[in-house]
Amino acid sequence: MASTTPITMEDLQKALETQSRALRAELAAGASQSRRPRPPRQRDSSTTGDDSGRDSGGPRRRRGNRGRGQRRDWSRAPPPPEERQETRSQTPAPKPSRAPPQQPQPPRMQTGRGGSAPRPELGPPTNPFQAAVARGLRPPLHDPDTEAPTEACVTSWLWSEGEGAVFYRVDLHFTNLGTPPLDEDGRWDPALMYNPCGPEPPAHVVRAYNQPAGDVRGVWGKGERTYAEQDFRVGGTRWHRLLRMPVRGLDGDSAPLPPHTTERIETRSARHPWRIRFGAPQAFLAGLLLAAVAVGTARAGLQPRADMAAPPTLPQPPRAHGQHYGHHHHQLPFLGHDGHHGGTLRVGQHHRNASDVLPGHWLQGGWGCYNLSDWHQGTHVCHTKHMDFWCVEHDRPPPATPTPLTTAANSTTAATPATAPAPCHAGLNDSCGGFLSGCGPMRLRHGADTRCGRLICGLSTTAQYPPTRFGCAMRWGLPPWELVVLTARPEDGWTCRGVPAHPGTRCPELVSPMGRATCSPASALWLATANALSLDHALAAFVLLVPWVLIFMVCRRTCRRRGAAAALTAVVLQGYNPPAYGEEAFTYLCTAPGCATQAPVPVRLAGVRFESKIVDGGCFAPWDLEATGACICEIPTDVSCEGLGAWVPTAPCARIWNGTQRACTFWAVNAYSSGGYAQLASYFNPGGSYYKQYHPTACEVEPAFGHSDAACWGFPTDTVMSVFALASYVQHPHKTVRVKFHTETRTVWQLSVAGVSCNVTTEHPFCNTPHGQLEVQVPPDPGDLVEYIMNHTGNQQSRWGLGSPNCHGPDWASPVCQRHSPDCSRLVGATPERPRLRLVDADDPLLRTAPGPGEVWVTPVIGSQARKCGLHIRAGPYGHATVEMPEWIHAHTTSDPWHPPGPLGLKFKTVRPVALPRTLAPPRNVRVTGCYQCGTPALVEGLAPGGGNCHLTVNGEDLGAFPPGKFVTAALLNTPPPYQVSCGGESDRASARVIDPAAQSFTGVVYGTHTTAVSETRQTWAEWAAAHWWQLTLGAICALLLAGLLACCAKCLYYLRGAIAPR
């Protein structure tokens, strides 16, 4: 197709003016050449338009271009002036008694003769189409002898996201120019279709309607009407446009569709002339599927119903006991259901949850309720074939004759033995009597150890019947009408037609003092209706109605704004499988980066980081205790930095001398060994007053009697040695402390779950992976933190303080409560106290300890040459009242901002596959270590094949799902070797090192309170559907009925959404 120039509204009007003038001239010329009187013709009563200008003998009947509500034919040009004058009546009209009201004059329209003239032949507009013609938009040009389109005005729609769910209705008339042309860039010009015959829309709507757009979002079909939907932007606002498209053009060819950007639509197909996308049926289909899921998953009371409580689940058949416990079988407790944790255990006078008292692996196997007496003291548990027995140690002798078993009326216990345990002995051949519950000699763990064990005497337990459980039986595929008693507790009093019910009894209805139980849907419905006034049933009814209300809201929202229909249809068409969890495991993970565990997929802690809002608290310079000194093998005459310049470094001495609160001390060692006792002794009077008279000094002078002068070696013993020490608090030029406040601190734990990285916090402790959902029990966030960044000659060290400081309390003098300067030049805190100097001998035991706060110890050191000695200085903590020193920071802070109190708890839920898994190769290098039928899990390890998760089975027992690679698990084994292992397909033999169950019948392990992982029973969708087929059938019927009602409502809203709130 050749490209053409886009046609504007001005070009369209000029073309219409030109064609109108040509048609007028042609009709006028034909009328003047052949003007003859026409024979009268009887008026057809069915026609209401003007019959002038029609040949009565013509084979065709003219049909006008009538729109909605039109009374005249506007499809052709008006008659010429000459013909108008002849057709008018020559009889003058009677004058009215009063002046008629002035009629509104039509606007002056442009003609083709360079001027403007009124259109008196039209008169005032009486309908929207006449109003469009009065505004200058000419009617379509048709041959009077050809049929015109029957539908003149159609309705299109516009709506904008910026204005909410407000629809603009645009009534327009198709300009009869045949096939709409295309622009040069291949886009369709919608301005050619804009010829309004209704109320004038707002200006911004007109601009949006005339905005060219080449992308088509969808095509809608309704009978012979076709709409194309487009979305585009006008001035930053996103608009949606629904355009009515002509079915066939005047040239006889189908009108071409606008170019589609996402798919190709074939218009010449015999079966599907139009492709409908994102229509209402898709939205209704989505609602239908959601309704089916909501009804199917709701337990609508179609199981065996009792008006008192929900029926319990089917119990596991009891396991067989060993032959050596056959005579105690009547005293053993009844077995319960796998994974059932609702039992209670009576210990003394208190009832406790069985999962808190019994060993951890009891939660994985069958168990019953035990009733212990008050005086029992033992906590041992004996195991045999997954059966556990509480055994006691007691010195109480048994009675001479055992008390017979009695049955109490209306009690939950069947038999209570009133016996006491026998005394325990050390011999293996001793026994405790026939009334014991299977307890025997306690063996050692190692099978090769032949040492004697000790006898653990058990107490016969109280047998308790399992709770009553029902099931429904079908007859020849009909609905379940009969009730089957699976387990019966005599105390419940269930009867069938007056006969007590026993396991295996089939009955339409059971009666007991607690109520009635039946499987009939009618009876179940009656029970539900009778109990509808209760809170539980009202809440259940509300929960069942919520999905329908949501579906209605979604459908209504979809019909009002089509943006949701596309998303909802995409979800339905692409498919969505809600996550269904098959297994649940719980384990712990340490908090050190790099820790890893198996739960059951590998989980590793990659790192821990903190996120917080940081506020700068400024910087300060801490006080620094600095000391210097010298060891001199004589008594100097000037004890100062200038007089001791040969022995003391000048720069540190001057910095310390000019510091704050300095301490300066001069010691003379062995002053009396140099002759002139009285003279030299007078030098060292208290306070050193005599020495200062002869020797200028600013330090305290003290004698050091008893100190060794061996530092100045190689001279007679009368050598005099002196020690000088100087210390003070100074501002160190290379020490600074910067303070930062951390608020809204949040700990982010970076985990790697089977190679998938995710971050968990206290706000979002979940991690969704392709293998399942991981829930992490993270410790609470540390809260507000204060960070001290200590810089010492370029080396930075951060210390963390927990919580905000109490500046009005004990932390008033802390660094965070002081005003700091950005350049770290301000000293913080009050002036410290004077340091204390002390002369310590080299062999003094005091040197084995550390100097006290504010103390400086000086020790003479023997030099490498004669008359050369050194000085060793040790400074203690700062030790003053102010707390802004680094010692305070170290004492009140920590290097790690947060130490979790314990490991992270990981709860992993594996995803249950909807489809059956593929057949995998058998696992390799599988080893089984441990024992079987002994109550202790055995270790199973090996390599799972690739291609998906391996559902490991050992001799037909499912041990769980494992990803490809190495796996290690523990399982209770019921069968002896050899062991056949598989992943659901081919099997292979595993190597086993197991202990004989006879040698490990009694492990003698002392248990406390344990928590362990609980594995739920896995069930496929097919199994679930087979077990609930009747519920699914009723749910589907209800869903179809309700979906039909919703479809009717949504359909009405969809087709009338613009008419409800037009603009």
From Swiss-Prot:
The chain crosses the membrane at residues 535-555, 1029-1049. Residues 1-131 are annotated as: Disordered. Residues 556-582 are cytoplasmic. Keywords: Calcium, Capsid protein, Clathrin-mediated endocytosis of virus by host, Disulfide bond, Fusion of virus membrane with host endosomal membrane, Fusion of virus membrane with host membrane, Glycoprotein, Host cytoplasm, Host Golgi apparatus, Host membrane, Host mitochondrion, Host-virus interaction, Lipoprotein, Membrane, Metal-binding, Palmitate, Phosphoprotein, RNA-binding, T=4 icosahedral capsid protein, Transmembrane, Transmembrane helix, Viral attachment to host cell, Viral envelope protein, Viral penetration into host cytoplasm, Virion, Virus endocytosis by host, Virus entry into host cell. It comes from Rubella virus (strain RA27/3 vaccine) (RUBV). Disulfide bonds join C153-C197, C590-C595, C619-C824, C641-C653, C699-C712, C758-C767, C807-C817, C931-C934, C950-C983. Residues 563-582 are annotated as: Functions as E1 signal peptide. This is Structural polyprotein. The record marks A300, G301, G582, E583 as: Cleavage. The modification Phosphoserine is found at S46. One of its GO terms (molecular function) is RNA binding.
